[in-house]
């Protein structure tokens, strides 16, 4: 991130962050289906007479259709919003449009790859998942260094997203080849199955509420910061997101390995083991974040100075508050997985998901009232604590 920030500059980094974030907002749809795909494949694997092949072929069909629908939405509403509503310097608008198209293509590729990624996680092939994750990071680092230090004269905000597209294609092809080779169900062709579609659609509709809340809390807040303060504050938000992702990644990887076990133990009827996983997983993931969050919160300014040199205004406050938000949110992650495993998520999503959606309107009211940008994180902490009580 330091190289990217120095390479692009604060203004272009803010553009890259806010335009990419706008595209990511549409992940609300794919996230709902991704959760359904992971749940149903894992559940079928946990059953003695399960049929993961039918789930996978149906999921692949749905994601291909979804990719086409999302592409249409981006090229109509998305382009209009980018050019008419977002606060971007006029002289960088053509480049912002290119970043938008590159982000759209990367997003479409990721949608199509969701069933294959879900299959790897459901089969608990964490060695492959970790290897491809490391490969993605290494490729990104190589591309960043190339763009930053290449002895050519080009617009870095055009070349960098182009290389990210290439990286995304390579990673998704790797998942495709691995799944086709090792998992029999992944050799099925896309197929519409009315029975599985009905179950997955019903699950996804209710899960849509939680995904909407997550997108509004993340990229929705990023959009609000752009509308009220411009791209410089978006750059600070991007820095905070990067730090938070690095810290939360430890707990996230732990949860990725734990979640299939919770779902499979429920499918097999082993409730005692499931509850022990929920309890230990919640405590361990909280401590994983806490170990890194405390020193970072205490020495945020020094860490950012060493890491980035000159960092955007509000970065220190944003990092500290975003880490606090993560500590509150991580407590309930295993409970969410357990509730998802049952397939009965309507009441949960209406209560907790509905509460989480309040992040966006409450943040808008706070900013409209003249509060500082940091107020959006205070709102997130208060809403998160309220959800724990539910």
Task: Label every PLM stretch briefly.
Residues 131-182, 203, 244, 353-358, ...:
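Hydrophobic alpha-helical transmembrane segments
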Residues 1-12, 83-87, 148-152, 215-246, ...:
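Helix-terminus/linker motif at the lipid-water interface of multi-pass membrane proteins
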Residues 2, 31-47, 122, 184, ...:
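Helix-loop junctions and terminal segments of transmembrane helices
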Residues 2, 14-30, 61, 205-206, ...:
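Alpha-helical transmembrane segments of polytopic membrane transporters and translocases
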Residues 80-102, 297-327:
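Interfacial segments at transmembrane-helix termini and the short loops linking adjacent helices
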Residues 3-25, 157-161, 195-203, 224-245, ...:
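Interfacial/gating helices of multi-pass transporter permease domains
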Residues 154-161, 173-218, 261, 268-276:
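Interhelical loop/hinge segments that connect adjacent transmembrane helices in multipass membrane
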Residues 108-135, 145, 179, 323-354:
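Membrane-interface junctions at transmembrane-helix termini in multi-pass inner-membrane proteins
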């Amino acid at each position: 991130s330091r190289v990217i920030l120095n390479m692009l500059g604060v203004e272009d980094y803010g553009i890259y962050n806010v335009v990419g974030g706008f595209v990511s907002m549409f992940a609300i749809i794919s996230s709902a289906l991704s959760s359904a795909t992971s749940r149903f494949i894992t559940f079928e694997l946990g059953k003695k007479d399960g049929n993961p092949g039918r789930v996978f072929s149906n999921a692949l069909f749905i994601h291909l259709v979804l990719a086409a629908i999302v592409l249409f939405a981006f090229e109509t509403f998305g382009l209009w919003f980018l050019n008419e509503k977002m606060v971007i310097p006029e002289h960088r608008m053509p480049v912002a449009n290119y970043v938008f198209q590159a982000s759209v293509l990367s997003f479409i590729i990721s949608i199509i790859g969701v069933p294959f990624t879900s299959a790897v996680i459901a089969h608990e092939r964490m060695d492959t998942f970790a290897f491809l994750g490391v490969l993605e990071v290494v490729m990104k680092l190589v591309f960043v260094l190339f763009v930053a230090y290449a002895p050519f004269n080009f617009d870095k905000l055009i070349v960098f997203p182009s290389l990210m597209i290439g990286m995304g294609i390579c990673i998704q092809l790797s998942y495709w080849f691995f799944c086709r080779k090792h998992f029999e169900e992944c050799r099925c062709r896309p197929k519409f199955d009315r029975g599985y579609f009905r179950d997955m659609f019903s699950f996804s509709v209710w899960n849509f509420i939680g995904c909407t809340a997550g997108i509004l809390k993340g990229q929705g807040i990023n959009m609000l910061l752009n509308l009220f303060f411009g791209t410089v504050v978006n750059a600070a938000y991007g820095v905070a997101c990067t730090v938070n992702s690095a810290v939360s990644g430890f707990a996230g990887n732990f949860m990725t390995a734990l979640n299939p076990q919770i779902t499979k133990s429920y499918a097999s009827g082993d409730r005692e083991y499931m509850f022990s996983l929920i309890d230990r997983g919640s405590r361990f993931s909280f401590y994983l974040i806490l170990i890194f969050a405390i020193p970072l919160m205490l020495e945020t300014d020094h860490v950012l100075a060493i890491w980035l040199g000159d960092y955007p205004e509000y970065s220190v406050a944003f990092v500290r508050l975003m880490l606090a938000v993560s500590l509150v949110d991580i407590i309930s992650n295993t409970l969410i997985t357990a509730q998802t495993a049952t397939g009965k998520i309507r009441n949960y999503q209406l209560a907790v998901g509905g509460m989480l959606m309040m992040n966006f309107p409450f943040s808008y009211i706070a900013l409209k009232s003249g509060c500082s940008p940091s107020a959006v994180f205070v709102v997130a902490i208060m809403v998160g604590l309220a959800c724990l009580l539910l």
